[in-house]
Amino acid sequence: MSASRSPTVLPADAPIEEERIPGYDPKRFLPVNPGDLLNNRYKIVAKVGWGTTSTVWLAQDTQRWWWNSNRYVTVKVTASDCVDDETAKHEQIITRHLKRNPSHDGFPFVRTMLDNFEAQGQNGPHLCLVYEPMREPLWLFQRRWENGKLPPALLKVYLRFLLRGLDYLHSECHIIHTDLKLDNILLGFEHPSVLEDFVQKQAENPMPRKIKDGRSIYLSHNDFGPPKSFGILPKIADFGLAQSGEGSEPLMHPIQPPLFHAPEVLLGTSWTYSADIWNLGVLIWNMMEGRDLFAHIRSSQGDYDVRAHLAEMIALLGAPPKILIDREIRWSGVKWSHAVPNSEGKLCETAREYFGGPFFNSEGEFMHKDLIPTDLRLEDSVLSLEGEDKRLFLNFIKQMLQWLPEDRKTAKELLEDPWLQAKSS
């Protein structure tokens, strides 16, 4: 074993990590240090991440029999003002809900909370959420492949896992994720030795830190190195924006990152589980082609342009059915349960207000035809497949990217699709 070196001390006047948050107040964040024991159970090893309202730490679970191997967890320590925050409570409730049926074959592909507790800090209690540690987000894993493209054979394996996870969310937990993106699909560790090696390296080469006003702030260490094998499983994670599909009222408020907005979200005709199916369909392009399906959805100033997004949908999928436009007209005056600020900060109560509609006239015609690309076809955007494999893939994806939510296949139905069953080179 090599000798441990002293940690690098960073300049006190150079902001790092959570200090860069606008309006940063150190009193909001619990001071956590390697070796600390949280909840008399979780011994802190290293800081592995941070966000606007939390820091994330790798910890050793000390509640195990002496003959068992080490067990590690990640502890998300939220800011003090998050204990009573509805978002933090919401995530806590949703993640508990996700344990409804651990025997379902999709359960292993959903990241669930292992424990939660409160830690007392200077400004009051801090809500702490405990999860299984994960190696890396899908976007980082993609970078390990040429041009960011997952090989079709591996993509099919991962899609089968993700669809099982979605089926579990939808059919068993009655949860709509609403925020499926590369950041929120995490990959596990290929072998426990990867974590053990990481912990050993932390002991030999501690995290750089800075000390300001008696408080240590650490530079995250979260690089676990290249995978030793690709037998690592993906999990759907981050349920902070997830919604229950069991309510009696229609769900209408805006969801999803702009790239992944489903048509019914943009048109305000209410959404349900099928919005996740659209979301995954769009995400598949990035996983397979290393680029976005909808490439021209921003203005010259970089702002999201709903008109351009709908125009690109029309170019790739054809015009929306008249029934959807009629539905949009009927729903246009229905107000959301609460006002939501748009990108300009204006409080909006309908999809038309929020997204700047209407976009179609009463005859169902798109009002911005000049924005529709004339040289864009769905078939031409698939470059990684050929022949029968490409034909089967297009049939598969078209069952996800349907204008009408009710026309999309469910996650369970998609698992039986011929493209997922066929072998890819």
What are these regions (language model features)?
Residues 1-425:
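Intrinsically disordered, low-complexity regulatory segments of kinases
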